[in-house]
Amino acid sequence: MSRFFTTGSDSESESSLSGEELVTKPVGGNYGKQPLLLSEDEEDTKRVVRSAKDKRFEELTNLIRTIRNAMKIRDVTKCLEEFELLGKAYGKAKSIVDKEGVPRFYIRILADLEDYLNELWEDKEGKKKMNKNNAKALSTLRQKIRKYNRDFESHITSYKQNPEQSADEDAEKNEEDSEGSSDEDEDEDGVSAATFLKKKSEAPSGESRKFLKKMDDEDEDSEDSEDDEDWDTGSTSSDSDSEEEEGKQTALASRFLKKAPTTDEDKKAAEKKREDKAKKKHDRKSKRLDEEEEDNEGGEWERVRGGVPLVKEKPKMFAKGTEITHAVVIKKLNEILQARGKKGTDRAAQIELLQLLVQIAAENNLGEGVIVKIKFNIIASLYDYNPNLATYMKPEMWGKCLDCINELMDILFANPNIFVGENILEESENLHNADQPLRVRGCILTLVERMDEEFTKIMQNTDPHSQEYVEHLKDEAQVCAIIERVQRYLEEKGTTEEVCRIYLLRILHTYYKFDYKAHQRQLTPPEGSSKSEQDQAENEGEDSAVLMERLCKYIYAKDRTDRIRTCAILCHIYHHALHSRWYQARDLMLMSHLQDNIQHADPPVQILYNRTMVQLGICAFRQGLTMDAHNALLDIQSSGRAKELLGQGLLLRSLQERNQEQEKVERRRQVPFHLHINLELLECVYLVSAMLLEIPYMAAHESDARRRMISKQFHHQLRVGERQPLLGPPESMREHVVAASKAMKMGDWKTCHSFIINEKMNGKVWDLFPEADKVRTMLVRKIQEESLRTYLFTYSSVYDSISMETLSDMFELDLPTVHSIISKMIINEELMASLDQPTQTVVMHRTEPTAQQNLALQLAEKLGSLVENNERVFDHKQGTYGGYFRDQKDGYRKNEGYMRRGGYRQQQSQTAY
């Protein structure tokens, strides 16, 4: 045992009194006078053996323990301080590490600390709750640990690949070699410093091995005595007595030579002590587990062991022998509902009680009125299961909700005498009197609207690229079926306002779906289809276009709220545009005047408006109306926030612009993935439309320095393409459009066509359209026509006349089309030329300046501006400011400056006379 403990202990005084004849334990100054008669020379020898290594690694272990304690209490400032000390201590032990290798407990703390800091850094809510010092220390320590760990990257990687094996190896060595470290250290670090220090001395030979074994036993004795010191002071005296007896038996020379006789009895005693120590450790662990179990009694947590699952008994709703009547069931229902929303209420148990109450009511034939009332409360409890608005329903709860609503609708359809409404008071409810119509307070429409919201939240919070999303999307068929059933119910018994609301729900689940069957029926004439196909079409019901027309017209006529009517109009326009009914969609948009006041609508309606405008622009593009397509898409694409404006994601902004609450609200407004519009397709349509408009315009106004830009985004893409020093083959969609634009500038329509329509662009964009071949044919036609216009604008100064047949062959257009294009250009005064009908040629008038003349005009303009600037500089040097005296040179020369020519002096001279 150490001198620091033996000096002030009672056991030492007792041993010195009992054994006065043996001078074996001098203290204080006697230590230096009698070095050969010490009773603690075993410990002195031990310190000599471990002095070069153990001190350094014990220091590292203590610092690591402090860091781990700081990590547990989230004290990052303390972690930073101790990490700096740890680095200094490791630098002191560098010579030992070079010989022995990096200790694994050191690698482990580096890896764990880095992972811990990364978790804190990613926890945004936790970072906001940190105080200023901890937040600053977190940033500093994170940078330091990342920089520091670069030197140990290979060690950390190997540790992370197999941390369990590393811990097991260290634990084995710890059990075999180090008996001097505490159990808490083993739990904290997994590897002790003593284990690492004894790696290379595992196989000493001869008597030195015996002596080392003896030293291990003595170390174990000393630790056991330290562990027991707090409980029994007598153990210390007995240990010291045994050490004195050993000191008598062993010669001093053998002490200095670090050799000691080792017998089989000593080995057995050491093994027994190891077993006792392991038993103590196991007892402490089991005691800790028992204490945890006692603490958890009466709480929610329960320790479960493998085996047969526990079957809980059903709760008893009523006492034995109670007569089940309507009043008793309603009273029990009110008791259950009183706990709803209170803190500590088990919501799952509440739902289970309500379901059990339904079974009891059905078994006792209490009537459908009671069952309907309980069903309403079950569905409401399912919606309240998650109190947080951001969280979505679990799959099992969602399934229960759908089943319960279907069961409720079955009861309502089977019992027409049951009336359900929000305006029915609880006092006026009739739940059991069959002579009168049954009246139940509740709103089936509100439940269905909440069901639709929950479905949207489920789709928003599911990974769209997973199979789980597909499984959830299959539930939409059930949702639509429930909405359709409620629609039929409300058409019979609901008010006009309720019918408008349920119609809007039906519209919102229909407007974005492309009706392929109706599209095929339009392509296939009735004469060409078989009788079975016609019968099948009749059985399928009305087309989506007819359904949308019927529902929307009812809302237009009956609705009294602007919001429902606005949403219905936008959905109707979207559906028309999706099915290529451009003129109906355009007329409905213009007649509604929504673009005038849409900025006053709420954000979800604005998102729907943006989606409708985008779909309208894509529809115009499919019809070949590039100008209309460009105008419809201009506002969305020019903002650079198409993703956010369409409700398909959030852009990265600074925290100052959007706090956490605003971000949550905006995420709840996002459109589910299956409603998304392809942003790459949208951008491609916009850029191609801009190309077909901008390139001919640029060619027509090439010499005009003040020409306006039709599309800033298109010009930006052109500038980006021109900045590249090396131009390779285009890869992205934007690069394809830029390359096609450069080819169109030269009038090379074939190269332009090859860049716009190829396998890569087909896969990314054009194959996504319902009528892809029709769109590609339209694009080829547009490229040929605009390339012809660009060619005439660019090279009109080169030709005196050109044959229309030549132009027809060059651009593979028929002669009437070429004639029509040139005639429009001449009528609009875009091309100064005339048509010679007998020869079918275009005669150029050469009224516009040539390229050389344009350059001369530009030079003259610049020289004129240069002369004006020089005159201003000269006047400034002469002392005339603002150009005043430049215009009044005669008055200046005649000494009639502005001080001499005022009306004030004239008035003075007149008054003098």
Curated annotation (Swiss-Prot):
The keyword Cytoplasm applies. It comes from the Eukaryota. Its main location: cytoplasm. The modification N6-acetyllysine is found at K99, K643. The modification Phosphothreonine is found at T524. Residues 522-531 have a biased composition (Polar residues). Residues 1-44, 157-301, 522-542, 885-913 are annotated as: Disordered. Residues 8-21 have a biased composition (Low complexity). It is found in: Cytoplasm. It holds the Pfam family PCI. GO terms for cellular component: eukaryotic 43S preinitiation complex; eukaryotic 48S preinitiation complex; eukaryotic translation initiation factor 3 complex. One of its GO terms (biological process) is formation of cytoplasmic translation initiation complex. GO terms for molecular function: RNA binding; translation initiation factor activity; translation initiation factor binding. Residues 166-190, 217-232 have a biased composition (Acidic residues). SMART domains: PINT. Phosphorylated. Phosphorylation is enhanced upon serum stimulation. Component of the eukaryotic translation initiation factor 3 (eIF-3) complex, which is required for several steps in the initiation of protein synthesis. The eIF-3 complex associates with the 40S ribosome and facilitates the recruitment of eIF-1, eIF-1A, eIF-2:GTP:methionyl-tRNAi and eIF-5 to form the 43S pre-initiation complex (43S PIC). The eIF-3 complex stimulates mRNA recruitment to the 43S PIC and scanning of the mRNA for AUG recognition. Component of the eukaryotic translation initiation factor 3 (eIF-3) complex, which is composed of 13 subunits: EIF3A, EIF3B, EIF3C, EIF3D, EIF3E, EIF3F, EIF3G, EIF3H, EIF3I, EIF3J, EIF3K, EIF3L and EIF3M. The eIF-3 complex appears to include 3 stable modules: module A is composed of EIF3A, EIF3B, EIF3G and EIF3I; module B is composed of EIF3F, EIF3H, and EIF3M; and module C is composed of EIF3C, EIF3D, EIF3E, EIF3K and EIF3L. EIF3C of module C binds EIF3B of module A and EIF3H of module B, thereby linking the three modules. EIF3J is a labile subunit that binds to the eIF-3 complex via EIF3B. This is Eukaryotic translation initiation factor 3 subunit C.
